Regions:
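A broad "ordered helical/assembly scaffold" signature
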Residues: 115-119, 186-192, 434
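Short linear motifs in intrinsically disordered/low-complexity regions
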Residues: 83-84, 94, 143, 161, ...
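Intrinsically disordered, low-complexity regulatory regions of eukaryotic regulatory proteins
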Residues: 173-174, 183, 192, 271
């Protein structure tokens, strides 16, 4: 008797992630031009420092997490790429500022980057009762606050202080001196920055700093190597504009490059900010006559939102892109990517730079300006879900993002097809696999139709795969879907009858 395993039926397709943002801007510390994965605000603060006055990257990332965002990538610009991750200065040589090295407990301690305050490293007693003499606790403080705690030993084990710090610390490195002691002396050392330390905001900024280069992995050009990103925002483009470091033409050049990047990748959206302090007529003129963007891979939000400024202990207006990306992520998690990310509360926003009326909304919405509005008793809400495309087929943001999701999921879930025999059996398996995935999406409400036949079709047969295509090594599958679209306007028809009663039809 023999047992033979035979594959049968459809192979399941797993939906890809739809809410991974990428932010490009200025930070107090951290590696330059290196896309760094960040999963929460604590990780961001540990790697890139806290809020920096005069910049918007920290506020955007904080607003993203506050509004429901998950993983994101952060790219710090303002200096040349430092492959060692030490946060080299604008000169790009990766040199640490003088005074950023000290000796503690028989070890040489070096700061990877200096934040807004001094970095202090302390050797403290090990936790627990009667610890071994070789064990101790290494505390790393930034501006007096403990940000890293390492339980280590002087012995050459996997818990050796040099090994642990190298693997886990984002702020310091530790090296053994000539004769490392068996017991680390208790004490502390401050790694102070001086005037030569790199600043969060460079003295000179150009459009190329944001755009970067794909080959050198700089700017948002370096994001091409990360396939999972679905949104791109550059909040500090506006901080440079406010400091007159970049002109309005430079702003347009960077945003056009963002759009081109997203169109080329085909799986992500550019979340754009307008210039600050524009009234509705000015933003309409900027959208139509100055910027003139036309892309199904970009969305624009207006106006700026007012948030609490932890750096200045006050309130300030910030570009909305970070908060909007968080709203996208929250909507995807709660309702699905097919739901338009609108009519959602903007968490953390206490006011708006411009209070919009219904008539102003009707002026801006048709040209693709997604308004953020304040409603009595309902808070500050996103009140638009359009792309910047002039093509009615791609007018709605959720339609474009749904197609991105379906395309990426099907492409990823059918990699097993490559090098399979290109025959009727393969085509049937492809049809079953994709149909099963789309039926599941239809049941979630992502596709329009009372039945699966009304919602989509999958065609993979001799018609889509003639002999010429087979000889060329191609297998072609045609998929058509009917996406759901948002109800932007609700119309009520009221009729009055002579009897005094009325009928309302929705």
């Amino acid at each position: 008797m023999y047992v033979e395993e035979v594959e049968a039926g459809a192979r399941p397709i797993e939906g890809v992630g739809t809410a991974v943002a990428a932010f490009v801007g200025f930070a107090g510390r951290g590696p330059f031009n290196t896309p760094t994965l960040v999963s929460n605000w604590a990780q961001y603060a540990q790697t890139f420092g806290d809020f920096v006055e005069g910049t918007y990257l920290g506020q955007a990332v904080y607003g993203y997490f506050l509004n429901g965002g998950g993983n994101c990538y952060v790219v710090r610009i303002g200096g040349e790429r430092d492959d060692a991750g030490t946060g080299g200065g604008p000169s790009g040589n990766g040199a640490l500022p003088s005074g950023a090295t000290g000796v503690l407990g028989g070890y040489k301690v070096t700061a990877k980057a200096i934040g807004a305050g001094d970095i202090t490293v302390e050797v403290a007693d090990a936790a627990g009762e009667n610890p071994a003499e070789d064990r101790f606790t290494l505390l790393v403080k930034d501006a007096g606050k403990v940000v890293e705690t390492h339980h280590v030993t002087t012995k050459r084990t996997k818990e050796n202080v040099v090994t642990v710090v190298r693997e886990k610390s984002n702020l310091i490195t530790v090296e053994e001196l000539a004769n490392p002691p068996a017991k680390a002396d208790r004490g502390a050392v401050a790694l102070r920055a001086d005037e030569s330390a790199p600043t969060a905001v460079p003295g000179k900024v150009a459009a190329d700093d944001y755009v970067g280069d794909v080959a050198d992995r700089t700017g948002f050009g370096g994001l091409e190597a990360i396939d999972e990103i679905t949104m791109v925002a550059v909040p500090d483009l506006m901080s440079a504009y406010q400091r007159d470091q970049i002109s309005l033409e430079g702003v347009k050049a960077v945003q056009l490059a963002m759009i081109a990047h997203c169109e080329q990748m085909g799986d992500r959206m550019a979340v754009l900010d307008p210039p600050p302090a524009l009234n509705p007529q000015q933003v309409r003129d900027w959208r139509q006559n100055v910027a003139g963007y036309d892309s199904k891979y970009a969305a624009l939000y207006y106006p700026w939102v007012k948030v609490f400024d932890a750096a200045g202990d006050d309130h300030l207006f910030v570009p909305p892109s970070g908060h909007m990306a968080g709203v996208w992520a929250r909507t995807d998690a709660g309702r699905g990517v097919h739901k338009a990310p609108a009519n959602e509360v903007v968490r953390g926003a206490v006011a708006l730079q411009t209070q919009l009326t219904k008539n102003e909304q009707e002026l801006l919405n048709p040209i693709g300006v997604n308004c953020v509005r304040s409603f009595p008793g309902r808070g500050i809400r996103v009140w638009g879900a359009r792309t910047l495309s002039s093509d009615p087929a791609w007018r709605y943001l959720n339609v474009r993002r749904l197609f991105n999701y379906l395309e990426e999921s099907i492409l990823s879930g059918t990699q097993w097809v490559v090098f399979e025999p290109n025959d009727d059996a393969l085509w049937a398996r492809i049809r079953r696999t994709i149909s099963a995935f789309l039926v599941n999406e239809w049941r979630k409400g992502a596709l329009f139709g009372l039945t699966p036949d009304e919602a989509f079709y999958v065609k993979c047969d001799r018609e889509t795969n003639p002999a010429e295509a087979i000889d060329a090594g191609q297998v072609v599958c045609e998929v058509g879907i009917a996406p759901v679209k948002p109800a932007e306007f609700v119309v009520f028809r009221l009729a009055q009858f002579s009897g005094g009663t009325s009928l309302v039809n929705e």
